[in-house]
From Swiss-Prot:
This is Sodium/potassium-transporting ATPase subunit beta-2. The chain crosses the membrane at residues 40-67. InterPro entries: Na/K_ATPase_sub_beta, Na/K_ATPase_sub_beta_sf. Keywords: Cell adhesion, Cell membrane, Disulfide bond, Glycoprotein, Ion transport, Membrane, Potassium, Potassium transport, Signal-anchor, Sodium, Sodium transport, Sodium/potassium transport, Transmembrane, Transmembrane helix, Transport. Residues 68-290 are extracellular. One of its GO terms (biological process) is positive regulation of neuron projection development. It comes from the Eukaryota. This is the non-catalytic component of the active enzyme, which catalyzes the hydrolysis of ATP coupled with the exchange of Na(+) and K(+) ions across the plasma membrane. The exact function of the beta-2 subunit is not known. Mediates cell adhesion of neurons and astrocytes, and promotes neurite outgrowth. The keyword Disulfide bond applies. The lineage of its organism: Eukaryota, Metazoa, Chordata, Craniata, Vertebrata.
Length: 290
């Protein structure tokens, strides 16, 4: 014979819960006395305090082996990559000459990007260096901080400097300037004591034909050795990255042109198919005319 348990009323269930939370007869809170709660809280306090102390100690020991200025370990990729300015989505530089808004955003980005390169700012912060040789600043046992940097003046960008330029870097006339910059790599040397230079080509035969003529600033797209080596963000506080400006003069209008620019130096490999940005950058250029 099955004996059915008596079903508790709602009031009984509530009373049982109230007694579980606080039992006035045994002076227990949620099944434990005050002493029991004190011991268990003390245990967890000591336990997590010990874990925190161990973690803090290991972090402190690790940080003693790390320099504040130069990373102990660097990326296996020693070849600097290239990027373009103005910075655009998918590296597409599209200019509609008749639509001021389409190229106005590029002009605003370039104005902001080139502001630190103004000659007055460079003269105030950086040194006039001797071209053709590395600007090395060894510590020689004593921390040489901060490192000095060489001037890269905006006027070196010639027709792409944007100084007193009514064409807005050429975007209003369909002759846009695109700026090539090399990513920073700490203690990078170009090798062979020869200045680097940037070259740009159309990726395919039809691209080369549609690309037309272009000029580079500084001349021949050169990047002088005096801007190297780079010692890191904390060491080289006022470091100014050298730029190469490419002014495209007669791109075939209304056609998408695939352009690839490379940095040429003795120890920079630009043929690594696993990294499309190692020493090179590819972008699309389109000049729309109505």
């Amino acid at each position: 014979m099955v004996i059915q348990k008596e079903k508790k009323s709602c009031g009984q269930v509530v009373e049982e819960w109230k007694e579980f939370v606080w039992n006035p007869r045994t002076h227990q809170f949620m099944g434990r006395t005050g002493t029991s709660w004190a011991f268990i809280l003390l245990f967890y306090l000591v336990f997590y305090g010990f874990l925190t102390a161990m973690f803090s100690l290991t972090m402190w020991v690790m940080l003693q082996t790390v320099s504040d200025h130069t990373p102990k370990y660097q990326d296996r990729l020693a070849t600097p990559g290239l990027m373009i300015r103005p910075k655009t989505e998918n590296l597409d530089v599209i200019v509609n000459i008749s639509d001021t808004e389409s190229w106005g955003q590029h002009v605003q980005k370039l104005n902001k990007f080139l502001e630190p390169y103004n000659d007055s700012i460079q003269a105030q912060k950086n040194d006039v260096c001797r071209p053709g040789r590395y600007y090395e600043q060894p510590d020689n046992g004593v921390l040489n901080y901060p490192k000095r940097a060489c001037q890269f003046n905006r006027t070196q960008l010639g027709d792409c400097s944007g100084i007193g330029d009514p064409t807005h870097y050429g975007y209003s006339t369909g002759q846009p300037c695109v700026f090539i910059k090399m990513n920073r790599v700490i203690n990078f040397y170009a090798g062979a004591n020869q200045s680097m230079n940037v070259t740009c080509v159309g990726k395919r035969d039809e691209d080369a034909e549609n690309l037309g003529h272009f000029v580079m600033f500084p001349a021949n797209g050169s990047i002088d050795l005096m801007y190297f080596p780079y010692y890191g963000k904390k060491f080289h506080v006022n470091y100014t990255q050298p730029l190469v400006a490419v002014k495209f003069l007669n791109v075939t209008p209304n056609v998408e042109v695939n352009v690839e620019c490379r940095i040429n130096a003795a120890n920079i490999a630009t043929d690594d198919e696993r990294d499309k940005f190692a020493g090179r950058v590819a972008f699309k250029l389109r000049i729309n005319k109505t």
